UniProtKB/Swiss-Prot annotation:
Residues annotated with N6,N6,N6-trimethyllysine modification: 5
Subcellular location(s) of the protein: Plastid, Chloroplast
Protein name in UniProt: Ribulose bisphosphate carboxylase large chain
Residues with the N6-carboxylysine modification: 192
Enzyme Commission number(s) of this protein: 4.1.1.39
Record's function text: RuBisCO catalyzes two reactions: the carboxylation of D-ribulose 1,5-bisphosphate, the primary event in carbon dioxide fixation, as well as the oxidative fragmentation of the pentose substrate in the photorespiration process. Both reactions occur simultaneously and in competition at the same active site.
Binding residues annotated for Mg(2+), in chain numbering: 192, 194-195
Binding site for substrate: 114, 164, 168, 286, 318, 370
Cross-referenced PROSITE patterns: RUBISCO_LARGE (PS00157)
Length: 394
């Protein structure tokens, strides 16, 4: 009989495989790993691969009932981060079978669910994911995408213009609708609910939807253009969220909105499916993203959250503004803006893109430049984002 030794064993014996040739169907991850003092980088990288796939802290008899070689994550390459002491990029390959089809939720639960609290690591950041076509093809993706949106709106060859209604909290529904009308009548394409406008005591969601619809139709009639207001459908339960989206559809408005990180990927994917089935555009706000992506050496980089959103579904997503910040940030932002819009994006480490990403024919997402921008930023914004973007003022 084949016996085995119980007890704690090094992960690198099983999960560090520098000679592994990655498969076209593997999901690849690049982690920025900061090991605890005294932990070798190979062990830290292997620990990440193990804990986010099949591993546990010892050998168990049930390991013999499956094929670890078929299902284990593998740390296949480690490189030191230039200019950082004791920090490494660990590349991990995951077999496709570890993931449920069409579930961003399951993908994140597997890859980042458990491993970030790991004792052997001082800090861990997921920098990038390579999503193979074999996996991305199991997702619907954006409800409509850039081209279909332009056809719906009949607006071509320029960025779309929007603004957020302020004060974001405290207006009555009627006064809110009045502000929406003034903005749309004045020439904007879109106005927007703020991310925290849901259904508060001073303005219940249905009242807001009705007055905003009235404002949209009045502005459309007077300008001869198609107008929209991002009606925030985010709610405390996914059933209530869908109820609000149904109401928006019945009013005949073109677009609804969702806070995808606070609302969650499961709710977001449900809403995206509803929007495609019912001809609604879907605007995505990234409230809470900085909790996850702000630290340089711990968390998840926004480019991963952006890729996940393209799979889960959204037609617009907030992507920062670049204006007035550091130059390096510009390249990194443009990197994930391309990941949102383009079909095929080459690996380019100078822009933070660790893997070549092939989306095949998944529709693109319009990046939304929003937050503290005003008319003087216009030349810079059109230079940075080009035509396929939404410039969201106010």
């Amino acid at each position: 009989s084949v016996g085995f030794k119980a007890g704690v064993k090094d992960y690198r014996l099983t999960y560090y495989t520098p000679d592994y040739e990655t498969l076209a169907t593997d999901i690849l991850a690049a982690f920025r790993v900061t090991p605890q003092p005294g932990v070798p980088p190979e062990e830290a990288g292997a620990a990440v691969a193990a804990e986010s796939s099949t591993g546990t802290w010892t050998t168990v008899w049930t390991d013999g009932l499956t094929s670890l070689d078929r299902y284990k994550g593998r740390c296949y390459h480690i490189e030191p981060v230039a200019g950082e002491e004791n920090q490494y990029i660990a590349y991990v390959a995951y077999p496709l079978d570890l993931f449920e089809e069409g579930s961003v939720t399951n993908m994140f639960t597997s890859i980042v669910g458990n491993v970030f609290g790991f004792k052997a690591l001082r800090a861990l950041r997921l920098e990038d994911l390579r999503i193979p076509p074999a996996y991305s093809k199991t997702f619907q993706g954006p409800p409509h995408g850039i081209q279909v949106e332009r056809d719906k709106l009949n607006k071509y060859g320029r960025p779309l213009l929007g603004c957020t209604i302020k004060p974001k909290l405290g207006l009555s529904a009627k006064n809110y609708g009045r502000a929406v009308y003034e903005c749309l009548r004045g020439g904007l394409d879109f106005t927007k609910d703020d991310e925290n406008v849901n259904s508060q005591p001073f303005m219940r969601w249905r009242d807001r939807f009705l007055f905003c619809a009235e404002a949209i139709y009045k502005a459309q009639a007077e300008t001869g253009e198609i107008k929209g207001h991002y009606l925030n459908a985010t709610a405390g339960t996914s059933e209530e969220m869908i109820k609000r989206a149904v109401c928006a559809r019945e009013l005949g408005v073109p677009i609804v909105m969702h806070d995808y990180l606070t609302g969650g990927f499961t709710a977001n994917t449900s809403l995206a499916h509803y929007c495609r089935d019912n001809g609604l555009l879907l605007h995505i706000h990234r409230a809470m993203h900085a909790v996850i992506d702000r630290q340089r050496n711990h968390g998840i980089h926004f480019r991963v959250l952006a890729k996940a959103l393209r799979m889960s579904g959204g037609d617009h997503i907030h992507s920062g503004t670049v204006v007035g910040k550091l130059e390096g940030e510009r390249d990194v932002t443009l990197g994930f803006v391309d990941l949102l819009r383009d079909d095929f994006i080459e690996k380019d480490r100078s822009r933070g893109i660790y893997f070549t990403q092939d989306w095949v024919s998944m529709p693109g997402v319009l990046p939304v430049a929003s937050g503290g921008i005003h008319v003087w930023h216009m030349p810079a914004l059109t230079d940075i984002f080009g035509d396929d973007s939404v410039l969201q003022f106010g």
